[in-house]
Amino acid sequence: ASWQPVGKDLAQYKSECRHGIGYTKISADYSDIHSEALYYVPLGKSYEVWALSVTNHSDHERNLTLSGYAEFTNHSNYEQDQVNLQYSLFISRTLFEGNRITQQIHGNLDAIPENENVDEKNVTERFFGLAGAEVSSYCGDKNEFLGSYHGYGNPEGIVCGDLGDKTSYNENSCGALSCKITLKAGETRTIAFLLGMKPSSEAAEVIR
């Protein structure tokens, strides 16, 4: 279930997208696997939840790799992100911590005490995390995720089934996480990807 299906033949792949008040649900069917992704922001919270449910409609056990991908901006200021690209690339990096990718803006200032402000450039952190399963591989670099001569229709990390465990430093950042699950015939499993802008310690509590 995806906003952009990864190059499947529409004779075999079916999808449906529904928008409601405060949520979007995308369902898909392919090769006897049914998936539903529900996107929403919990009431009173400041992060997104992407709840993904996968059901095995075949008559045998299936081994699946589930992946989520979020493309970060390099700066919260539009002008800096879109115009001053050399600068915004320089100040962006990603880290992997347990069950999440953390993107740092002005990460080069991370050695400065948390409450000390340098030229109004405190370190800003965004996160893309996984709840309900263990991360099997990750990628924090957009170019590494897509791969050479690949695009969003066939990203190398998805085609290979392994995201390569790469982070980004002075490049275009992203958050990509994969997990491996086994479903018995008729079984359903639900996991959740979470996306937001919070310090790492707060992100850990959100995902827990």
State where each predicted segment sits.
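Anionic coordination/interaction segments
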Residues: 1-208
